[in-house]
Amino acid sequence: SRCKCSEGGSKVMILMIDNYDSFTYNVYQYIGSLYPQIQVVRNDEITIDEIRNLQNLEALVISPGPGYPDSAGISKEAIKTFGKEIPVLGICLGHQAIGEVYGGKVVPAKELMHGKMSEITINNKNPLFEGLEDKIYAARYHSLIIDDETFPEDLKVIGRDEKGQIMAVC
């Protein structure tokens, strides 16, 4: 299932697609502390065939970035191609791209959230949030969300903010 994380160890290879965002390397450093075999590549500097040829690829991380998912280079195509084979974690723009790939629409949020903290209610039974309380605080830097009214049947909402907006999907 794309909702589960792989076990740790040096054989696990994670590819992070960088959507030209300054936060990418913060995420890279954190993931790298758990899974040392992580590679970052810009969204316009790799092909699907090159991704397919990576040895021991266990997961994809789609980084934050500016704009809408259609401006995220190979990100949406990578989600379409590998999303049913390996776990894909989308952060901000990556999260929105997952929503679009599975049939949802990305729309402006009710309010801009640039550098603001919010309480997020999560499904802590999902492996992504294992070990966390059912409410967490998260820093937010976005102005777009996955639309609730067009939310894809193939996905589940596993996190919402205090206004009910979708913050995490699986």
For each predicted feature, which ranges?
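Cysteine-nucleophile active-site neighborhood
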Residues: L54-G131
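Glycine-rich nucleotide phosphate-binding loop and flanking beta-alpha elements
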Residues: F23, G67-Y68, D147
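Structural signature of beta-strand start/N-cap positions in the alpha/beta core
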Residues: M13, Q37, E58, P87-L89, ...
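Catalytic beta-strand/loop cores that center a nucleophilic Ser/Cys/Thr
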Residues: N126-C170
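Short, Lys/Arg-enriched N-terminal segments with co-localized hydrophobic residues
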Residues: R2-V12
